Amino acid sequence: MITVSVLNQRYPCRTRDRLWYREIKTAIDKILAGDLTTPDIGKVSLDDNIFNASSASRSKEIAQAVTRRINAVDSAYLSFFATRNMENQQLLCIVMVMLTDHSFLEFMDTVYREKLIQHDDILRDSDIMGFFHRLQEKDENAAKWTDAGIKKARDNYKSMLKEAGMLSESGTERKIIRPILDKEMEDFLQSEGLARIYKILAGERE
């Protein structure tokens, strides 16, 4: 069972985040094979460059994101991840982002899910910027974010959703691609206490 502790955390404005699918898959494969432990991800990433980072600083940045996301789930999640195809694994990576980024979780809940429910299949830059501005109005920490930082976070959201197969390739208006969730995925997310996140991905009301 996974605790969605991110709901008690501050809203971050992550300007350099990515889906990191291949990096997360590499780490999970090594953990399940007994070749890596989560606390060692940072050291192994720096010493052996297992994520093929372009620099030491980038290696550290990737390792921090991968560690944060893997720490947010349990061993059952890692094992389930390993059994799924690439498309499902990318969706599971999106779930891991939601579990570690309060801002992204709220965006997916209030914007992406509502689009699915209303059968509005276009995500506009203005939808994402409007979300951030509403967040700034209600949260004093978010109110300090710069416009430049918000635009970078917006672009990161689009990039992650595109890589996960949930958004079309490019443009200020992008077509939303409804995720395909089989019964096994639904049952697993429900059993892990992630019913809310399942409903976000499925475009269902609470």
Feature locations, PLM:
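Leucine-rich, amphipathic alpha-helical/linker segments
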Residues: 10-17, 30, 97-98, 102-103, ...
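Long, low-complexity intrinsically disordered regions
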Residues: 112, 116, 120, 136-145
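DNA-recognition alpha helix
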Residues: 124-140
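Positively charged, polyanion-binding regions of nucleic-acid-associated proteins
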Residues: 92-95, 100-121
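Catalytic DNA-binding helix-loop module of base-excision-repair DNA glycosylases/AP lyases
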Residues: 106-112, 127-132, 160, 164
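Eukaryotic partner-binding/assembly regions in large regulatory complexes
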Residues: 1-91
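Accessory, usually C-terminal, subdomains that scaffold auxiliary metal cofactors
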Residues: 143-206
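Short runs of predominantly hydrophobic/aromatic residues within well-ordered alpha helices
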Residues: 17-27, 59, 63, 101-108, ...
